[in-house]
């Protein structure tokens, strides 16, 4: 159990017999009233966001999570297959658990998967991923860095805005947090 004032974004807590991931936390002490912690959190089972106000004295149960490094192998349309890099055991996950992470998954990508009581609950991607451009308008010769961008479809189906000098077949580095172009890879 931890104090509500110790909550931080990214932590997973058990609240009302459900697992929640802390999205945003703000500690407030208005005037001469008792302090409280305003928390915005995401229910891991359904993905719904809720807000809750904890008293500064409240105690919250932090979920004991196990983290394993896994390597993405392939998908068959329904399941996404991963291999544990320590013991080579394979497992599959559904798109419900992976969420938007599927837009960045390419074979041999190493990710961290968090488990609670033996069940996978979330996937942590690396900060950036190198992906190949499969469809975009032809590049403009002599184009340099500017505010002008064009859409580019990547090998995973993700569409990002790229500078005009990027062509089909090129590898680019994409931020997994924002889903945006970073640089050529």
Where are these regions (language model features)?
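Acidic-enriched and Gly/Ser
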Residues: 2-185
